[in-house]
Amino acid sequence: MADTTPNGPQGAGAVQFMMTNKLDTAMWLSRLFTVYCSALFVLPLLGLHEAASFYQRALLANALTSALRLHQRLPHFQLSRAFLAQALLEDSCHYLLYSLIFVNSYPVTMSIFPVLLFSLLHAATYTKKVLDARGSNSLPLLRSVLDKLSANQQNILKFIACNEIFLMPATVFMLFSGQGSLLQPFIYYRFLTLRYSSRRNPYCRTLFNELRIVVEHIIMKPACPLFVRRLCLQSIAFISRLAPTVP
């Protein structure tokens, strides 16, 4: 009896915290489900046919999470242009659109990584809050894993941004290979411009600039053929014209 009494208040504290923050708890559960489905798609332990269904479930769960988060950020829905403009500034709206773009498309492993990693990062943050409510010294091994995940957050966000960027040519390739729709590259381009302009997550914009600097450094070397240099410079100029203006 003496061993079990301390666990009661700890567990009650965690449950009370989750009940007090019901919307955050609902998003936490949907993110954990997204991570679960994404993992079973990336690692098809139950077979390739089941993996495709887990791909769709992961995107649907992410759409639910994004919708809940958007409601949390903008609780008072209005059918107006001003509300839509405000919604398009939110990262949750971006990934609601992202989920809808890919949910009925041919399964692409690259497209599931942003969903998986964002869900993992946000779920880890809330899990730490639940553990804190349970007790400052509860489950030290899990806390250690969560701390390591947080320590690598910047690298993970850069990897997500890299996926977001290279999915643009991937959607074009899918179109010409017969695995994508005609509208998908255009809608995804709109998503990418929203990510480029994101106020809360500048990693997509930063990575674009870093890639441009790296390419320019390589093509300016004397060993680079002239036609390759011209092609790259024209491509950089074209992409720069497509980039939205960021205030």
UniProtKB/Swiss-Prot annotation:
TM annotation in the entry: 32-52, 101-121, 156-176
Residues in compartment: Lumenal: 2-31, 122-155
Residues the record lists as N-acetylalanine modifications: 2
Family statement: Belongs to the PER33/POM33 family.
Stretches of the chain found on the membrane's Cytoplasmic side: 53-100, 177-247
Subunit structure as annotated in this protein's UniProt entry: Interacts with EIF2AK3. Interacts with ARL6IP1, isoform RTN1-A of RTN1, isoform RTN2-B of RTN2, isoform 3 of RTN3 and isoform 3 of RTN4. Interacts with RNF5. Interacts with RNF26. Interacts with PKD2.
Tissue: Prostate cancer and several cancer cell lines (at protein level). Widely expressed. Expressed at higher levels in endocrine-resistant breast cancer cells as compared to endocrine-sensitive breast cancer cells. Expressed at higher levels in early recurrence breast cancer tissues as compared to non-recurrent breast tumors.
Name of this chain's protein: Transmembrane protein 33
UniProtKB keywords: Acetylation, Endoplasmic reticulum, Immunity, Innate immunity, Membrane, Nucleus, Transmembrane, Transmembrane helix
